[in-house]
Amino acid sequence: MATSQAAKRRAMAKKRAKKKRNKILLLITEFFVLALLVVVVYGVTKTEKVTKVRIDEEEIKAKMNDNVVDSVVLKGYRNIALFGVDSREGSLGKGTRSDTIIIASINNDTGDIRLCSVYRDTYLNLGNDSYNKCNAAYAKGGPEQAINMLNMNMDLNITDYVTVGFEGLIQTIDALGGVYIDVQQNEIVHLNNYQISMVGKTTDKKTYTATEGVDYIAVKEPGLQKLNGLQATAYCRIRYVGDDFMRAQRQRTVLAAVMDECKKTDPATLNKILEAALPNVATSLDVSEMTAMLGNVTKYNITGSDGFPFETNRSTGTVGSKGSCVIPVHLDENVALLHKFLFDEETYQVSAQVQQYSQKVSSDTGR
């Protein structure tokens, strides 16, 4: 009997201790969430530092291809255009060519993200029925024309964008404490040369514009290592190893590494990132959208990345005065592959507009 009562007391004590631990855990969790919210609100108060480039969403929707606006499949995803520009003069809008073009497709239900680089030299309709290398769209009409270019050529419904200057990427990665990248031996010399070009060092051939307040630290060995902001940004820009296709892959690799570090970060570091990044960012997203995305950062996972045109359906060649271009072979086939990759549409039928643009690209390039 005494043994039974002692067992009951031990069980009750264990239960009370468990409840106490759960209560403490709940308090710690609530404190952390509150702290995170405070930091997010603090960051939102700084959104006047973000460059707001006005875009006409209704005009963008008016230029979308047949059946895109009402697509049931596309409504299950949030598609955002990401642009990276080399603008140390502070210009993030029209007049600056986009060195980086990435479609980020977020599954609304799962939080899974798939990234697709659009190779900047791809020969496409620029969104105004003229044809050239696709990165010219941003230079000619800023983010709005670049979004139209993506939507029209690829049957997409993008209405939002984020543009980051390379200096913003440098500062963001430094605020995170660096990112881990596996650097190959044949990439080191080019990585260091791009660093030199961005910090204002002088070489025998050329004097470069300085990136203020950034020091050059040479990468000396291959292998997995932590790169600082300048090193990682220089890594993104390498195009002499694997050409522009590998360059785009490196950009996606760095973006994924940044995402991994952000998911592990604490509120104080998040504050540093906001301070560093916001002055070098232009976006169409409003305060509530940015707050919601920051609040869901732990939900997001990058589950796939690729490049457009796809490896099996592209070639390179000279297209008259446009010079050397990446040529989709053929555009309509690549768009079908894109919808399979981003949205799991196995038998996607491209729009009549994409068929028309595909014929024009083939006619101009002879492919």
Model regions: which residues?
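Second-shell loop/turn segments in exported
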Residues: E89-L92, N132-K140, D155-D160, P222, ...
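Flexible, polar/acidic helix-loop-strand segments at domain edges
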Residues: D174-T269
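Solvent-exposed, acidic/flexible segments
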Residues: V73-N79, V85, G93-R97, G127, ...
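Amphipathic, coiled-coil-like alpha-helical scaffolding segments used for oligomerization/assembly
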Residues: K140-D204, A210, S284-D286, M290
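Extracytoplasmic
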Residues: K75-R78, T96-I101, T110-V118, D129, ...
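Extracytoplasmic/secreted envelope proteins and their assembly/folding machinery
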Residues: S98-T100, Y131, P143-N151, F166-I170, ...
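Entry/capping segment at the start of metal-dependent catalytic domains
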Residues: T3-G111, A292-G295
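C-terminal solvent-exposed extensions
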Residues: M64-D70, Y77, L126, N280-R367
